[in-house]
Amino acid sequence: MSTEQFVLPDLLESCPLKDATNPYYKEAAAESRAWINGYDIFTDRKRAEFIQGQNELLCSHVYWYAGREQLRTTCDFVNLLFVVDEVSDEQNGKGARETGQVFFKAMKYPDWDDGSILAKVTKEFMARFTRLAGPRNTKRFIDLCESYTACVGEEAELRERSELLDLASYIPLRRQNSAVLLCFALVEYILGIDLADEVYEDEMFMKAYWAACDQVCWANDIYSYDMEQSKGLAGNNIVSILMNENGTNLQETADYIGERCGEFVSDYISAKSQISPSLGPEALQFIDFVGYWMIGNIEWCFETPRYFGSRHLEIKETRVVHLRPKEVPEGLSSEDCIESDDE
């Protein structure tokens, strides 16, 4: 196999869960896209990437059971995450931490406002979320947001130093900076439940939780690797971490990721079957619906041009990825996004 191409693992084969889409997708997606575009945050190129990425379609797959209002809220959140992610990818460690602080403070403190677009967008999302979210769910969501922003800053610092972590250090970082855990927290919001903190201390519950999270993170990394290497952003990717740590080539690494993703799914199914009924039906319901992230994310990755460009449907069939050349970077208007009115 040429080093200029590789074959993706067949993650659909290893994930027996059934995919579905949300009937409210078109309306919720259009409203959310208009909302975020109304702030004129993106350069022309970034706006095109935003539209092509179809973040709202991801929500339709992974939250297929959500009501109309709840789906709109999840679409707003993944679009907000796109803004934070795209801004921080263009920044050094200091800049990414400043962006993260704006995001976190606007999320946590209702009366805090630095006048920036990011703060305004974040506060508008939070007003929608807290209207229906329970108090424990809200607190966990904000705590996860703090961890997410810290890890996004750490990712930028690692990128600035051209430093690759070892696998043991990368996994906890990726669990947080991927925002998957924040997206899992939205499951409680959608279902209208507010799990006790003790549920998140249960061994089998957390084993299923982490297995689902890792499957989503590793799958996303193998699918996004070509796009990220073309942008010079592959340092925060399990593919680069494993090749560096294990001395394997790209194809060997892709094959290994496929094996591990299959194991994550098996671990999730096994742990879910062992969750004690004493945790209550809502705990099992939550874990059930978290699982749809594993299959929904896979389907979405092939359904849009975000990772594979115009050949995304062909690549779903052949699984052959031809590596793209490095891009000439064009920034997103990050200064406008985080600059306050007072400056």
UniProtKB/Swiss-Prot annotation:
(2E,6E)-farnesyl diphosphate binds at residues 306-307. Terpene cyclase that catalyzes the cyclization of farnesyl diphosphate (FPP) to various sesquiterpenes, including cubebol as the major product and beta-copaene, delta-cadinene, germacrene D, germacrene D-4-ol, sativene, tau-muurolol, beta-cubebene and beta-elemene as minor compounds, along with minute amounts of further sesquiterpenoids. Optimum temperature is 29 degrees Celsius. Mg(2+) 2 binds at residue 85. The record marks 82 as: Plays a critical role in the stabilization of intermediate cation. It catalyses: (2E,6E)-farnesyl diphosphate + H2O = cubebol + diphosphate; (2E,6E)-farnesyl diphosphate = beta-copaene + diphosphate; (2E,6E)-farnesyl diphosphate = delta-cadinene + diphosphate; (2E,6E)-farnesyl diphosphate = germacrene D + diphosphate. Mg(2+) 1 binds at residue 85. The gene is cubA. The keyword Cytoplasm does not apply. Gene3D superfamilies: Farnesyl Diphosphate Synthase (1.10.600.10). The conserved DDXXD and NSE/DTE motifs are important for the catalytic activity, presumably through binding to Mg(2+). InterPro entries: Isoprenoid_synthase_dom_sf, Terpene_cyclase-like_2. Belongs to the terpene synthase family. Its EC number is 4.2.3.-, 4.2.3.127, 4.2.3.128, 4.2.3.129. A motif (DDXXD motif) lies at residues 85-89. Mg(2+) 3 binds at residues 220, 224, 228. A motif (NSE/DTE motif) lies at residues 220-228. Signal peptide: none annotated. Its cofactor is Mg(2+). This is Cubebol synthase cubA.
